[in-house]
Every structure is written in C-alpha cells, then in structure tokens.
Regions:
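A polyanion-binding, active-site-adjacent surface
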Residues: 1-219, 245-251, 261-270
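Asp/Glu-rich intrinsically disordered low-complexity tracts
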Residues: 215, 220, 225, 231, ...
Length: 270
C-alpha cells in the first residue's frame, strides 16, 4: 500500500504527463488547459464526472461553476468537504461548446482516469451522470435506471463500491432531479462506513528456475574456445568500464536542479 506522500508524488507525475497530452487533436487545439482533477490524494470517496466546462477550462479545476456549487452544497449536507474527496472527469479537456464526449475521445482519455483510480484507491466511486457510469460499469444501462443503486464492481485491478447519481449540471436543468440527487447523496456516508469491498487475490507471476551454471576449468577448453573466452572477458571488461562512465554521467544529470514547474499542490489540485 502506497504512503500518502507516494500517492501525491505519483499523481504529480501523472498530472504533468496529462498536461502535455495531444491524443485528441481537436481538444488539444481548442482547450485552454487540461483539467486533471482535484482533491485529496488519499480519499476514500472519488467523484467522476463527464468533462470540463467553460469555467473549469479557464481555471484548471473541476466543478467550479454552478454545478460545482451544487456539488459543494450536497457534500456539506452529508458532512464532507472537497478536501476530503477527489473529483475528476472522464475527459480532461473541454469539448468545444460543451458538446458530448466522442467515443474516440473517451478511448483516448480513459487511461488517465483509470490510473488516477489505481493511485488513489478509493473505496467508493460516485459516478456523476451517464458517461462516467457507462465507462466504469462497462455497460450501456442509463443513469435513469441506475441512480442511487450501489454495487460492487471491478474498476481496473481493484474492487470498489460504485454509486451512480445524476450529474449536478443535468439536475440543475430539471429542478425535481435536484431533490432526487440530494436523496441519493444521503446514502454516501453509509457506503463509506462499509469500507472497502473484498479484493481479488493478487496475481502471482510464475517463477522461472534458472539453470545452474557449469564451471569449466581452463585446461578443459580447446585452444579455439580458450581464445574466444579471453576475447569475451576483454569485451566484458570494456563494456563494464563504459557502463560505469555512463552511470556517472546519469548520476550527475540527476543531480541537476529540476525545472521550476509549479507543484500540483500549489495549484490546489491535491
């Protein structure tokens, strides 16, 4: 199990990797910034939405518009705050005009989400809306049928409690759905109290037995074989010397100060 500092460091590395992503040509050209996600790197509860909107694209943080205000309110009503959860989206870049994500975009971006989940190791994932729910369930059943129903699912290599609810932005368009969303949220504390579901046994790599080396006395080698052995020894010595020099150079390079990029914590990410 990774320590809190190790998780933050791993998320930092993934954050910088995602910032340079250009897998989706259109999104890379039209985005203002990559909205990686924000919150507690050691959260038991993780929210997964659809994609950044205009406000999120400008600020680089998820759920900072009206939908974000509703999310904050709902969290407060169950005794939680943003610094206790982690919030991410299926897409890290804003689709132009807030259109729906394209299947190819989801395919391109899902690796980042699954790696986030693997690093954070939440016990409960609350999917906000159809896109997140369908992706993490590997199923096309819609949110109208699934909202408020918890189930244990495999997400990547881990078993989690998956809890689909309406997306806050969609609920704002239909006021009656806000009440439904509020009612569903009230089940989250109980789900968290259950703890992590039983995990599958870890995969064990089959061991490969190496054949024992057979030592041969120099006198047992034929003249040609002895010469070849001498050449091999000379080459090995030269290679080892070259490698030692390369390692020294690499160590010196590693000692160079890192570029002055902002740490994600300075951006309020995690």
């Amino acid at each position: 199990v990774a320590s809190p500092d190790e998780r933050r460091e791993s998320l930092k590395e993934l954050f910088h990797e995602a910032r340079g992503c250009v897998r989706c040509t259109q999104l890379a050209q039209t985005r203002h910034t990559v909205v990686f996600g924000a919150g507690n790197a050691n959260a038991d509860l993780m929210f997964v939405g659809e994609a950044p909107g205009r406000n999120e694209d400008e600020r680089g943080l998820p759920f900072v518009g009206q939908a974000g205000k509703l999310l904050d309110t709902l969290l407060g009503e169950i005794g939680l705050a943003r610094d206790q959860v982690f919030i991410a989206n299926v897409l890290k870049c804003r689709p132009p005009g807030n259109r729906d994500p394209h299947p190819a975009e989801i395919e391109n971006c899902q690796e980042y989400l699954f790696r986030q989940i693997e690093l954070i190791e939440p016990t409960v994932i609350c999917t906000l809306g159809n896109f997140a729910t369908k992706l993490l369930r590997h199923d096309t059943t819609g949110i109208m049928r699934l909202h408020g129903r918890a189930e244990v699912r495999m997400v990547g290599p881990r078993s989690v409690r998956l809890f689909p609810v309406f997306h806050p932005a969609a609920a704002l368009y239909t006021p009656s759905n806000v009440d439904v969303l509020r009612q569903d949220f009230r089940a989250l504390p109980e789900l968290l109290a259950l703890g992590a579901p039983e995990q599958p046994p870890p995969l064990v790599e089959p061991s490969v037995e190496e054949e024992p080396l057979v030592e041969v006395e120099a006198g047992e080698l034929a003249p040609g074989e002895a010469a070849a052995a001498g050449d091999a020894a000379a080459v090995g010595t030269a290679t080892a010397s070259a490698d030692a020099g390369s390692l020294g150079a690499a160590d010196e390079a590693a000692a160079e100060p890192a570029s002055a990029e902002p740490h994600p914590a300075q951006l309020g990410l995690f």
